Amino acid sequence: MRKSVIAGNWKMHMTCAEAKSYLKEFIPLIKDINEDRKVVIAPPFTAISTFSNHSDFDYLDISSQNIHWEDQGAFTAEISPKMLLEHGVSYAIVGHSEPRKYFSESDEQINKRAVFAQSSGLTPIVCVGETLEQRERGEAVRVITRQVEQGLENTDPSNLIVAYEPIWAIGTGKTCQAEDANKICSLIRKLIGFDDVIIQYGGSVKPNNIDEIMSMSDIDGVLVGGASLDPNSFARIANYQ
């Protein structure tokens, strides 16, 4: 049975002091969480140590928001798996739509990050998704297929999470209909060819739509942005019914 993974991506939010205050409020809210699910938070790099030093660390796992494909070198602004593992990081978000958009990150680069994350002992959360223009032109399936085939080449599906995040739904308040999201997640599972791969949905996930999203057969979790910044909101998402 696939375990549900509820992940919060804080992006460029939260200082160390704010993260500490957040955890103090959040952790009691998830202490009784079902054993069939895992909670993950991806804080800014500067706040990772706040998580790894927290006494109640057992209740959730840490993810980085990106990762490089080398352990060291002249790669300004990048971070390596070796550096992250020192701080108890277990996951790494790869290929999020924002690096794809703002830094022109390619499927080839995303693949290198994902493969190296796995070889270093981390589980990559590889993001895929179409733009509004691509969706309106009927190109969503073609785009997702390309991103999966090129971005996941030579990866181990047993140590992998794929997050379907339709770009037009991120931070816009627009949510992909649960049935439509489930169809894309089913497509991703078929493309990978491994029934037990964990597939998340991301895109304006909130407390008022989490129960419907998680009732879908091919959605195994969510990648949450803005709603993960409030401890009560994210706890409600983690404790979905």
UniProtKB/Swiss-Prot annotation:
Q: Where is the active site?
A: H96 (electrophile), E165 (proton acceptor)
Pfam families per UniProt: TIM (PF00121)
Q: What is its main location?
A: cytoplasm
Q: Which GO terms describe its molecular function?
A: triose-phosphate isomerase activity
GO BP terms: namely: gluconeogenesis; glyceraldehyde-3-phosphate biosynthetic process; glycerol catabolic process; glycolytic process
Q: Which InterPro entries match?
A: Aldolase_TIM, TIM_sf, TrioseP_Isoase_bac/euk, Triosephosphate_isomerase, Triosephosphate_isomerase_AS
Q: Where in the cell is it found?
A: Cytoplasm
Catalysed reactions, semicolon-separated: D-glyceraldehyde 3-phosphate = dihydroxyacetone phosphate
Which PROSITE patterns does the record match to this protein?
A: TIM_1 (PS00171), TIM_2 (PS51440)
EC number(s)? 5.3.1.1
- Reading the lineage from the top rank, the first entry is Bacteria
Keywords (A to Z) from UniProt: Cytoplasm, Gluconeogenesis, Glycolysis, Isomerase
Q: What are its GO cellular component terms?
A: cytosol
Give the pathway. Answer: Carbohydrate biosynthesis; gluconeogenesis; Carbohydrate degradation; glycolysis; D-glyceraldehyde 3-phosphate from glycerone phosphate: step 1/1
Q: Which residues bind substrate?
A: N9, W10, K11, G171, S204, G225, G226
Quaternary structure annotation from Swiss-Prot or TrEMBL: Homodimer.
Summarizing the function annotation, the protein's role is:
Involved in the gluconeogenesis. Catalyzes stereospecifically the conversion of dihydroxyacetone phosphate (DHAP) to D-glyceraldehyde-3-phosphate (G3P).
- Annotated family: Belongs to the triosephosphate isomerase family.
| Name this protein carries in UniProt | Triosephosphate isomerase
Encoding gene, per UniProt annotation: tpiA
